[in-house]
Regions:
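Switch II of P-loop NTPase G domains
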Residues: 57
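Cell-envelope and extracellular/periplasmic
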Residues: 50, 54, 78-79
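Alpha-helical cap/lid subdomain in secreted, periplasmic
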Residues: 60-209
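Serine-esterase "nucleophile elbow" of acetyl-processing enzymes
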Residues: 1-52, 63-70
Length: 209
C-alpha cells in the first residue's frame, strides 16, 4: 500500500479559523481537521495563520505567510467580519477570490468555508435576523462563485450549520456569538470530508507525477 504524503495544512481567515470561543486549542478547527487527516493516514503539519477580526480584505498578509511555506492545502474561513462591518458583499467576495487565486497560483489546494448564517447567533436581536440572514446568504452566493472561478473548492456552511446552531445554544460560547468547543466539532464534521477529498485528490495527482 502506497504511503500517503506529508501534507502542510494552513488555516486562514477570521476568528472561526483561529478558534475563538473554544475552551482548548484541541477543540478548534485546525487540530480537528488535522486529526481527521491523520486518521486517514496523512502526516500533517499544521499552521494557523488566521487572525480574529480579519476581513476578506486583510487576507493578503495571511496568504503571503502561507505561500512562503509553501502550503499544500489551505482552509479559508472568511466573511463574518465583512458582514458585521457592512462591507459590500461584492467587495468582500472579490477580495476572497483574489486570496484564493494567489494560493492556487502558489500550488496550494484551497477549501473555502463560506460565510455562516449569523442570524442564528443568540446575540443577534430577533427583529434583525431576517435582514442578517439575507445578507449572509447573498455573501455566501458570491463567495461560492469567486472561489470556484479561482479554482478553489467551496464548503457551504450557511444553511446546514444554521439548522444545528439555531436549535442548540450549547454550540455557542459564553459570548453567544462564537462557537463553543462543541460548536467547532459540528463545523469540523462538515468540513473534514471535503478537506479529505481534496487531500486525496492531491495525493492521487502526486502519485502519478
Amino acid at each position: 500500500m502506497t504511503a500517503l504524503p506529508r501534507i502542510r495544512l494552513v488555516l486562514l481567515g477570521d476568528s472561526l479559523a483561529y478558534g475563538t470561543g473554544a475552551a482548548r486549542r484541541d477543540q478548534t478547527l485546525g487540530p480537528r481537521l488535522t486529526a481527521a487527516l491523520a486518521a486517514a493516514g496523512y502526516a500533517v503539519e499544521l499552521h494557523v495563520f488566521a487572525v480574529p477580526g480579519a476581513t476578506s480584505a486583510s487576507l493578503g498578509a495571511q496568504v503571503r505567510r502561507a505561500t512562503a511555506l509553501p502550503a499544500d492545502l489551505a482552509v479559508v474561513v472568511s466573511g463574518a467580519n465583512d458582514l458585521a462591518r457592512l462591507v459590500p458583499p461584492a467587495d468582500a467576495a472579490r477580495d476572497l477570490g483574489t486570496a484564493t487565486a494567489a494560493l492556487r497560483a502558489a500550488g496550494a489546494d484551497v477549501v473555502v468555508a463560506t460565510a455562516p448564517d449569523m442570524s442564528v447567533a443568540p446575540v443577534v436581536p430577533r427583529g434583525a435576523r431576517p435582514l442578517v440572514r439575507a445578507g449572509c446568504a447573498a455573501l455566501e452566493r458570491l463567495q461560492a462563485e469567486v472561489v470556484q472561478a479561482a479554482g478553489g473548492t467551496v464548503a457551504r456552511l450557511g444553511a446546514e450549520l444554521a439548522t444545528a446552531f439555531g436549535t442548540d445554544t450549547s454550540l455557542f460560547a459564553t459570548d453567544r456569538y462564537h462557537p463553543s468547543g462543541a460548536g467547532y466539532a459540528v463545523i469540523a464534521a462538515r468540513l473534514a470530508p471535503i478537506v479529505r477529498t481534496v487531500a486525496d485528490r492531491r495525493a492521487a495527482i502526486a502519485s502519478t507525477a
